[in-house]
Structures are given as structure tokens and as C-alpha cells.
């Protein structure tokens, strides 16, 4: 059922060409981005080929999401078919899943990373003490991290919720719980150390050095200041995930309203579960329960504590989905029938709202692609006309288009204009055009029109940016917004360069 629901939610994306800014640089890519620490991503994405194939990648992604839901259901020993369906639907329609499909060329790899993270927790259950399963858990976390580091948090939050469930069930002694925690520390320490060693070894053998993307080059350089900044950033990220800045900016939408209600519901069911299980009668268990709740915030964005240059976004916060899932599980276990039904209806509404958000996003991606195609076609026609009289060696793009590329749509009934960011979560990543630099321009035109353009080197761009000829040019689409300067075809979109 998870497979079908996820497929239906994202069918618009899977059956259309809806690229984002990164996609047009990845029509075909082996995803061998070892410099970013993702040494297993190429292998994971290779399962569906290295082409950006929306339908095939979508099917693989749905499969991995479904298997992840199966693992979670097995972990918490759930047998209610409605709850099982709801768990799969929450994962398939989560904000993290939606944004991951923006970058669909790696989506199947990232969903495999999520599955491995879930398996790691399942293999390290409190009643599972076989060394082979500990080894499987270590390898799953190591590989998950090697595909996409953000899914380490998915494993951590899932493990925390599983441990909370253990504490509430009163099935294990204090010593059993302590032994399980020690086992987790060992498993995560060994797996992350192994990940780091493999990464360093592969870079040494290939001669590649780490890049600065998301602060990966600073990984391992920890200090007290970093711990303080990491805690502050993790708290901020946790809050903004639920509010999406809307309240703080004087705006509110359905996404934020649902999340506020969810937080209230989560607090209520936590109190109910503590009272019903009489957890307060075991002080050591209550203390561990409290520590688990506190740990959720830093664990959800754990990489803040390893580098000060990382920036979290929705696709890196799939771990938050576990909080929704476990809240549903708590209502199933401890709430009265009327509250169970109410919670079920609420989370179905959350899934529906997330599905609407997904498709609104895809609607804007479609507009973006059509605008880009039309704009690039005009650029190609202008270039052909210019080539009749002049020649050039490379192309340079001037002007940061993102400042004036935000979507606005007119309500034909009220005649009011609305900004895209008010209606969907990821407005910051959808622009009116996919073309934002010389590389994206040349690659899009070469793939779609067969015209090969060589992007100018940075030194050439720097020299031209200081020239009076560029300053005297008008901005696109003016007739003289395209000009050959010292053998370089210059296209000036605006004065922000």
C-alpha cells in the first residue's frame, strides 16, 4: 500500500520532465562525488542507471520507501492495517521526501540510504545480541552515511523512539536498557569511524581532496565553541522545520497550522502514555525517557556538531518524519478509541496536505521548465543570428537572476498577485528560470538544442566584469544585451554581478 500511495502522491513528478537548477547539470552523472564524502552514492544510484529517468527512479524510490515502512512496522510490532498504511503514507508524503524528488537524479540512492538506516536500528534491537546482527547494523549505518550523511539522523531518531517504546512497555530491566545504550554507542562509533576511514582511504587512492560543500572539509575538527553553535543551530532548525518561518514573518499557512496541532497532540499523548504505563514509578526509566526526548533535537541535525559550515534543509530532515510516525503509534497504544480515531483523521489530513504541497511544487517546477525552455530557445536564435557576422570562443553569463525570478501568480477573481512562497514550502528553490550561470546555460542549451557552448573561465569573466563595454550593455531581453567582447559571447541579464 505504501508503494501505491507514494506513487500516486508523486505521479506528476515521475511522469513529467520537471528539473530543478541542479537537475540540468545531471542529465547523466555517475554521482561519484567522493569529495563530498558520499563514497557509496555512485553505487546506490547506479541501480537505476546514471541517467535522470523520472519514472524508473521513482519506482525504485517507492520500493525503498515501502521497505523502510515494513522495517518500521516490524520494529514496533504493529499489526493494525490502518496504522501500517498511515506510516507508509507519512514517509511517502513527508517534506523531506518531497524535496528529495526535486533532486530526482539521486532520489533512489537517498531512499536506499533511508532503508539502510532503518535496517541498522532493526538489527540492533534490545532482544538481538548476535554478533552477526551487530555487524550488519554497523555496515548499514556505514553504507547509509556513505550514500548520504543526513540519514544517520534518521537511524538515531528511530533508535530513540524505539528505546522510548521499550521504556514504556516495562519489559526490560534497568541493566538491559543500559546494555542496549552501550551497544548503540559502540555500533555508531565504529560505523562512523569506519565510514571516515573508507572515505579517507578512497581519497588517498584517487588523489581527490575534500571540497567545501556543507563544510565537509572541516569534518572532525571539533571544539567547545562548535558544540555550543551546533546546539543553538539544531534548536533553531528543529523549530523552523515545523513553522517554516511563517509565524516568525507574520504569515501562517496550512502546513504550519497542522504542525502546531501536531506538537500539541504529541505533548498530550506523551503525558497520557507516562500516566497509563506508570513510568513515573520507575525513576531511572523516567530519567532515561526525559533524556530521550531532549536528545531528539541534537540528533535530528547531528552534523551541526561536526562542522560550522553545514546548512540544513528539508531533504536532510527525514528523521522528523519518525516523530509523526511514533506519535501515531502512541495514540494507537494508549489513547481511548475516540481519540485514536481523531488522531487517525488528523494524520490522514496531514498526508493529504503534504500531497497537495508536493503537487503545487511540481506545478511550479513545470512552469519553471517551460519558461527556461522558451527563454533558452530565444537565446539560441539570437546566437545563430549573431554567428552570421561574428565568431566567439566561449560564453559568459552576467547577472544574478534569482533576485527577480520568484514566481507570482494572479488570482483572476480578486486580481491580486500571490507569491509562490506563501503557497508551498520550498519557494526558495523554485525560480522562474533554471539558468543562473554560464555552466547551467551552456549545458541546458547543449542538451536540448545541440549547440555546444564553452563556459568562459573565471579569469575571463572577471576581466569582462570590469570592462566599460559590459557596463554600457542593456539587460536581457534588450537587443544589445548580447555581445561579443574579446572573443567571448556575453549575455547580460541584469546588473547584479
Language-model region placement:
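Hydrophobic, aromatic-rich transmembrane alpha-helices
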Residues: 243-285
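Membrane-interface alpha helices of multi-pass inner-membrane proteins
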Residues: 133-149, 154, 160
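Perimembrane helix-loop-helix junctions
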Residues: 154-189
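Membrane-interface micro-motifs in multi-pass membrane enzymes
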Residues: 34, 38, 61, 82-125, ...
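Membrane-interface transmembrane helices that cradle and orient dolichyl/undecaprenyl
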Residues: 117-133, 166-172
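Signature aromatic-anchored transmembrane alpha helix within multi-pass, membrane-resident enzymes
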Residues: 131-135, 332-358
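Intrinsically disordered, polar/acidic, low-complexity terminal segments
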Residues: 1-35, 39, 45-67, 76-88, ...
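Transmembrane alpha-helix segments characteristic
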Residues: 91-92, 279-305, 349-351
Amino acid at each position: 500500500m505504501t508503494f501505491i500511495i507514494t506513487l500516486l502522491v508523486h505521479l506528476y513528478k515521475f511522469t513529467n520532465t520537471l528539473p530543478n537548477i541542479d537537475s540540468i547539470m545531471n542529465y547523466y552523472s555517475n554521482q561519484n562525488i567522493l569529495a563530498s564524502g558520499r563514497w557509496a552514492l555512485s553505487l546506490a544510484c547506479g541501480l537505476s542507471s546514471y541517467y535522470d529517468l523520472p519514472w524508473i527512479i521513482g519506482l525504485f524510490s517507492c520500493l525503498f520507501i515501502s521497505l523502510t515502512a515494513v522495517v518500521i512496522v516490524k520494529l514496533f510490532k504493529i499489526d493494525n492495517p490502518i496504522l501500517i498504511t498511515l506510516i507508509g503514507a507519512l514517509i511517502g508524503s513527508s517534506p523531506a521526501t518531497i524535496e528529495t524528488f526535486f533532486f530526482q537524479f539521486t532520489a533512489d540512492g537517498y531512499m536506499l540510504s533511508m532503508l539502510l538506516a532503518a535496517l541498522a536500528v532493526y538489527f540492533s534491537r534490545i532482544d538481538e545480541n548476535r554478533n552477526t546482527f551487530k555487524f550488519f547494523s554497523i555496515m548499514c549505518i556505514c553504507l547509509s552515511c556513505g550514500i548520504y550523511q543526513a540519514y544517520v539522523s534518521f537511524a538515531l531518531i528511530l533508535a530513540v523512539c524505539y528505546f522510548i517504546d521499550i521504556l514504556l512497555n516495562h519489559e526490560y530491566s534497568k541493566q538491559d536498557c543500559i546494555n542496549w545504550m552501550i551497544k548503540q554507542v559502540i555500533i555508531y562509533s565504529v560505523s562512523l569511524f569506519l565510514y571516515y576511514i573508507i572515505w579517507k582511504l578512497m581519497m588517498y587512492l584517487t588523489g581527490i581532496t575534500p571540497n567545501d560543500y556543507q563544510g565537509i572539509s572541516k569534518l572532525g575538527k571539533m571544539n567547545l565553541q562548535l558544540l555550543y553553535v551546533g546546539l543553538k543551530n539544531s534548536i533553531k532548525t528543529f523549530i523552523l522545520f515545523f513553522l517554516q518561518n511563517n509565524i516568525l514573518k507574520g504569515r501562517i499557512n496550512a502546513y504550519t497550522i497542522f504542525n502546531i496541532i501536531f506538537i500539541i497532540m504529541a505533548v498530550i499523548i506523551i503525558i497520557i502514555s507516562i500516566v497509563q504505563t506508570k513510568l513515573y514509578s520507575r525513576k531511572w526509566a523516567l530519567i532515561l525517557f526525559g533524556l530521550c526526548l531532549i536528545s531528539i533535537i541534537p540528533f535530528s541535525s547531528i552534523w551541526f556538531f561536526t562542522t560550522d559550515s553545514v546548512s540544513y534543509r528539508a531533504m536532510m530532515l527525514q528523521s522528523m518524519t519518525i516523530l509523526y510516525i511514533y506519535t501515531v503509534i502512541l495514540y494507537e497504544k494508549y489513547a481511548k478509541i475516540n481519540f485514536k480515531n481523531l488522531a487517525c483523521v488528523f494524520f490522514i489530513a496531514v498526508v493529504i496536505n503534504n500531497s497537495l504541497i508536493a503537487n503545487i511544487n511540481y506545478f511550479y517546477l513545470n512552469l519553471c521548465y517551460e519558461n527556461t525552455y522558451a527563454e533558452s530557445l530565444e537565446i539560441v536564435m539570437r546566437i545563430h543570428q549573431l554567428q552570421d557576422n561574428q565568431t566567439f570562443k566561449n560564453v559568459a553569463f552576467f547577472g544574478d537572476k534569482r533576485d527577480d525570478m520568484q514566481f507570482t501568480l494572479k488570482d483572476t477573481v480578486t486580481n491580486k498577485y500571490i507569491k509562490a512562497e506563501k503557497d508551498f514550502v520550498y519557494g526558495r528553490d523554485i525560480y522562474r528560470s533554471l539558468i543562473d550561470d554560464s555552466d547551467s546555460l551552456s549545458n541546458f542549451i547543449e542538451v536540448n538544442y545541440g549547440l555546444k557552448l564553452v563556459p568562459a573561465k573565471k579569469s575571463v569573466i572577471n576581466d569582462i566584469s570590469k570592462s566599460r563595454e559590459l557596463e554600457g550593455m542593456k539587460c536581457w531581453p534588450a537587443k544589445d544585451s548580447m555581445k561579443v567582447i574579446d572573443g567571448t559571447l556575453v549575455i547580460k541579464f541584469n546588473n547584479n554581478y
